[in-house]
Regions:
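Non-catalytic terminal segments and appended small domains
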Residues: 1-147
């Protein structure tokens, strides 16, 4: 297991734990300061029951979406770390490791890879300070989500 996966695993366990209110408030405010979170669009850190609640916080009000048809809208507050053409079945570098696009996409459905094998890709990196929710500002019906 890559070190970043191990760190994520243990941090996730810690983040889900709900501590006594004064301790949780200290943890939350420390995390906000340490990571440099901009909380202007969110509730005050003291209102979150766990670090995970803070990590997956909701926006107080909806963001305005640019309606220009030529604008590309990101589904996340993130940094695009890679983009390009899928070549030789390798396009994804996640947490320090390369992944086979075919293996990643066919784990649940074998026909997924054929649809994208000559396509393009983008990797979105969400840092610990980023807003960790996804949005799809388009008119469609989601049939399946694989995480």
């Amino acid at each position: 297991m890559h070190i970043t996966n191990l760190i994520s695993l243990y941090f996730g366990k810690f983040a889900k734990k709900e501590f006594l209110s004064p301790v949780q408030k200290l943890i939350n405010s420390s995390y906000v300061r340490l990571m440099g979170l901009n909380m202007s669009e969110f509730k005050h850190p003291r209102y979150y029951k766990s670090l995970n609640d803070l990590f997956t916080r909701e926006l107080i009000k909806k963001r305005v979406i640019d309606e220009n048809k030529n604008t590309i809208i990101s589904p996340t507050d993130s940094l695009i770390t890679q983009c390009g053409q899928i070549q030789n079945d390798i396009a994804l570098q996640i947490k320090g490791m390369q992944y086979s696009v075919e293996e990643l996409l066919t784990y649940y459905c074998s026909s997924n890879f054929e649809k994208v094998k000559d396509g393009s890709f983008m990797n979105f990196y969400l840092s610990p300070k980023d807003y960790h929710r996804y949005h799809a500002p388009v008119d469609f019906k989601l049939l399946k989500l694989i995480h």
